[in-house]
């Protein structure tokens, strides 16, 4: 029950790890420990990095400083074509690079073509095999300049890329292509979309690919990186021996204007009208030139200021919503990289119906307020403290950085000459800059950004009559923004002086149980609540809290479902007690405190964490959240208005409408599974929200809470009895029982073909099985191997051999609670005329697996990675990790069983014991007597319209 809460509480701050690395730089003398870099006479740059953290494995990368932007008008799409061809025949791998990798159980490889560059990677290569690692170097060497580009490979990849083009087709690509001219001001970036046009993909010639490859894939535009558990000296010798064979020929100099985007003084304007637009909205986009080789202090400040902006600026919209003054359904703003040397600030808004112009004025008013007044010292300093704590936590983390992090540092060094520095030194440099910053610094930076230069305004709608904000209306609003300044203002926030200003009667601990294995205690309170407490000084001044109960949607009677849905959506949207959300946000500033509620299908939960110094604030806030939850009538009315608006404007044509029909076919509407339509939303009763909240959170006796961290027992008892013990609770009420939420149709077989308008000729196929048989641990493992085996076989046959699809997805799910259930689904896209053939092959390959007609190599390729992962999970666990102990306490709360960290980590390997017979048996078991679904969505054929590509 606690699993989702635990994940929220104790997740590794990877965003911090990624963010705090890449724009922080240090002097050249602080080069990373374990790094060897150099440059060969032919111009190839190399990086070898071993910091000792990636034991037993290495990652191999090629970075090619050529992307779609380098293509001329007769080459658009060829950079991406080359990426595909790279996994086919090369000088030293005539049977294909992909075949070689997969034959050696190397299944984690990738390539990415962007507008500015192309990247290749082979991951998790075992370093104990010296010959295999040398062969990885030869693969990189061939990618540099040894791809064969054979006619048969070109035609194979042409078919696959056309399927990829169709796979990506849809309103999102139409939107991206349509707005590119205003976002990029008609520069080269506006016309280079990486994949190219369908016409060009059908017609390009082998010689064109060769010419592009020979021209641009040269050592002076490439670097390789080997990162992991490798010997620096030996690897460097091997690199020199292998890569000296590359031709010593330079790629032509790149005209700096290729990547230049000209300024536009006046705003650019575009209306994007498409019947598949999901909601009427508008966006304001502003482009900035941010040089990658700017002075170090400028780069560090840009990075830190961007993090501040992306955290604090969106809160202005939240404050308007909290004050009930918003003219929008949704609004957001962000600052992020656009293309090389450019950033973009994006303001996007979905207005309430009939309030389009007011919403625009409000967005511009918020923008002007940030420009003219900036952030307050209070909000800046609170965020500064959080950012500082985050950086310090990252410095203390083990395994600082990942191979991909290191690759990005090498990229900066290669492109801009920025010294590659030790991760910890870089973060320390960031901290030095952060502590010196004041609110005036970021406000001056914002004022310099929020000009009217390089703007683009775009409206999005289904029809020309919708969202009809003209260019003149936008420009008029932009000029009149000072007059609309009050639209960005919220009412003065009255500070909270004492969160709980009334007496509460503390509870008592009426029973205490020693949990010896867990070294914890279980307290039963007089209101029936149970609290499992563990002292963990390794939490270093923090504590973690989680509470859960059987509940969620599964306990809601059909007649109350609408009220429940609304209550769930409006949790914490109207504040608590006598405080609104803006007051609470102000009160929370500077407090190292997090608290959230969750309502899942089968459970109700609460969770959070805080510094021990803020423990009283945390538990006082928890008490109000659980006992004084507010539901505002005005917030409720806007929720109903917003829901009805979104329902009325839902897509009624195209793929979205078809998907809605499919859902109703597979999961028919019933009282327990109602359609969320106009009648549903109009049936919601405002008074029902409080009743539903009380039903789920109003009886503390239904909950078991866990409290773990650096908080002494006496203090923990004081907090628990005062705040949790004072909650309403009645242990005499029976524990709640869930009902399975299975709304699938009872029909054993459903086969249906739908048709819809489509401009890409792409058909969708979904084949699935659903069964309700119990699986042992071994059978569950066999199911995972079966899924991987199927996906591999479908990839080999449907994509590589038959060229019927770009990708095939196979999913398998097994759940044991509240009832046993397993499902298997296969999803792919193909052209209309290939539907029958693709379906036939899907069933044929599945039948082959059930009959054990697959090779031992295919079995091992699917099983071995899972077996290796299983061995890795058996590594010793960190007994100081709060998430480990929360998980163990959760096991006890749910089962009554006490497990030690050693016992929880101990497990008998399963995957390595599996046989091909086990895979065939489980495939047969889950599909025999299962409910089967075969859903096909085909494009409509119009006379004279070509659909078979």
Where are these regions (language model features)?
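N-terminal secretory signal peptides that target proteins for export/translocation
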Residues: 1-9
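Bacterial N-terminal signal peptides
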Residues: 13-24
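Proteolytic maturation boundary segments
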Residues: 30-45, 231-299, 303, 310, ...
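M16 family metallopeptidases and their MPP-like homologs
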Residues: 49, 54-71, 77-81, 96-142, ...
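Peptidyl-prolyl cis-trans isomerase
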Residues: 146-154, 437-441, 445, 630-636, ...
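Hydrophobic, small-residue-rich alpha-helical packing segments that form membrane-like cores
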Residues: 158-166, 171-208, 212-221, 227, ...
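Flexible, low-complexity linker/tail segments at the boundary of structured domains
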Residues: 217, 697-698
